[in-house]
Structure formats: structure tokens, C-alpha cells
Design a protein with these regions (language model features):
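Accessory nucleic acid-recognition modules appended to NTPase machines
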Residues: 3-177
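Short secondary-structure transition/capping segments
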Residues: 82, 134-138, 200-208, 254-257
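Hydrophobic/aromatic beta-strand patches that form the interior of the parallel beta-sheet core
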Residues: 106, 157, 179-181, 210-212, ...
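Residues at the C-termini of beta-strands that transition into short coil/loop
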Residues: 109, 160, 184, 213-215, ...
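Short conserved micro-motifs at the rims of enzyme active sites and ligand-binding pockets
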Residues: 117-119, 182, 192-193, 222, ...
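Active-site ExK catalytic segment of metal-dependent nucleases
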Residues: 172, 177-188
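Catalytic cores of nucleic-acid endonucleases
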Residues: 185-227
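Domain-level recognition of nuclease-like catalytic cores that cleave nucleotide substrates
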Residues: 215-257
Length: 257
């Protein structure tokens, strides 16, 4: 959210993010009468924020919130329709099998997700598991944003095998996987970080394999391109509409305490 950069301190930023979330509830959802009963939807937002970037268990969320599975599905549809986030579907060449697997949902802004999950007061340390989640969330949002500017946008999906091996993002056009993307928050990419990407990407017939991270060095490990996240995204979205905002820094997103 651009408004955050104009605020002077973290307290003001936290207050803004919480107020934004409440305004969304009042004006976008209740005001437009997307839902008749706001209480379960409010509970759903909290759970959805906690589940950000994870496989969606519609039945489990419904049980926690007190609504049925179809209602949870309609809630997620409301979020996508109001541009509050993006559903990333699982990859499978069979549409029928794809529909049997669970999608992931990413809120459009890491700060809003943290406000809704009530974690704004928890510091995000670079070595923590939470930092890895926030970094992945940040990169996915950048990919979604840059992809929207493309004349011929990619179809975005993720891949997860039965033994829980995963590729974070697949970028497809014309039924072909042009990029298989692994997101790592490390500042020192090693062979262990790209092992699964190498194998699964090869099985998929992906044209290019890339790992983007906080590592400033450009290298190639076992056929996998390894780039800093900024240059990596510039490489993927290399046309004139795909340039990153030069003023954008990750610390501006996650260092809100």
C-alpha cells in the first residue's frame, strides 16, 4: 500500500493497516451486501489470513468459522472479486485432477495479511520461518502484479506432489511451462535449495528453471538459474511493462514489527 510510505513510524503504519482492514469490511463487504451475516465472514478473514499461502482446507475453515464448505468457497470468491487477493490453482495437465486439488490464496498485501492475522506486533527476523513465509508472499504478489501488465500474461499455478515436494510457481503460456520458479529467503543459495526444482522442473518439461532469493550473486546450479529477487523478476518480465519499481524494498514491507 503506497500510503504506508508516507507515515512516520511503525505505530502509525500498524494503525493504518488495521483501519484499512475494518474499512474493507464495512464498505466493500457490508456496504455492498456481499454477505448478509458479517460475523462469520469476519472470523473467516482471520482464518484466511492465518492460512495465507497454504493449501486451502475449505471444510476445515468452515468448521472453524461455523459455516458450510460452499459458503467458505463463496467467501474466497468475494475476496478475489474485490481484488483483496489471488487464488493460485494447483498445476496438473488434467483439468479434472486439478479440480480435486486445493488452491492457495495470497492476500494482495503482506501488511494487510498480518493485520488480519493479528501478527503486526511480532517482529519478522530474517532467519525465522515467518520471514520465509512473508518473503514468499511478497514475491508471489510481485509476480501477480507484473503479470497483470503483460500483453500476453502467464497462467500461474503451483505444483505439489503426493510426498509434499513443491514448486512455488509455474508460469505457463499455451499449455507450456515457460518458467518454474522457486522462492527462497536465504542470502546464500546452495544446491540443496534447488534440488527439488531441478527434478520436478525436468519432469514437467519446463523451459527454464529459476530460483530467486536475497542472494546478490548470479549463478547457475545444476541447470537452475539463481538470481536476486529483483533481477530475477526483471529477467522473467523483461518487456517494457515488466519493470520493478526501483524504490521498492523488501524491508519496507516486513519491518513493521
Amino acid at each position: 500500500l503506497p500510503e504506508l510510505y508516507e507515515l512516520e513510524n511503525d505505530i502509525e503504519r500498524e494503525q493504518f493497516l488495521r483501519a484499512y482492514a475494518l474499512t474493507y469490511l464495512k464498505e466493500e463487504i457490508w456496504g455492498e451486501q456481499f454477505v448478509r451475516n458479517l460475523d462469520p465472514f469476519r472470523s473467516f478473514l482471520s482464518v484466511a489470513a492465518q492460512m495465507n499461502g497454504k493449501l486451502i482446507n475449505f471444510t476445515g475453515i468452515g468448521r472453524d468459522v461455523g459455516v458450510d464448505t460452499k459458503t467458505v468457497q463463496s467467501y474466497y470468491q468475494i475476496l478475489t472479486d474485490t481484488l483483496v487477493g489471488t487464488l493460485i490453482e494447483p498445476h496438473h495437465r488434467s483439468i479434472r485432477k486439478r479440480q480435486r486439488q486445493a488452491p492457495k490464496f495470497y492476500f494482495f498485501d503482506t501488511g494487510i495479511q498480518r493485520a488480519l492475522s493479528d501478527t503486526l506486533d511480532q517482529p519478522v527476523k530474517p532467519t525465522s520461518y515467518q520471514y520465509g513465509n512473508v518473503f514468499e508472499h511478497f514475491i508471489v504478489n510481485e509476480v501477480v502484479k507484473l503479470n497483470a501488465y503483460q500483453r500476453h500474461p502467464f497462467s500461474l499455478s503451483y505444483m505439489r506432489t503426493e510426498d509434499d515436494v513443491e514448486i512455488d510457481l509455474l508460469l505457463e503460456r499455451g499449455g507450456k511451462v515457460l518458467w518454474a520458479l522457486e522462492i527462497k529467503s536465504t542470502d546464500q543459495v546452495q544446491a540443496k535449495h534447488v534440488r527439488h526444482l531441478k527434478q520436478l522442473g525436468k519432469d514437467l518439461g519446463a523451459h527454464r528453471l529459476i530460483c530467486i532469493s536475497r542472494d546478490n550473486s548470479v549463478k547457475q546450479i545444476d541447470g537452475v538459474l539463481c538470481h536476486h529477487w529483483r533481477t530475477g523478476l526483471d529477467l522473467i518480465f523483461s518487456d517494457k511493462h515488466g519493470k520493478l519499481d526501483p524504490g521498492l524494498e523488501l524491508h519496507e514491507v516486513v519491518d513493521l514489527k
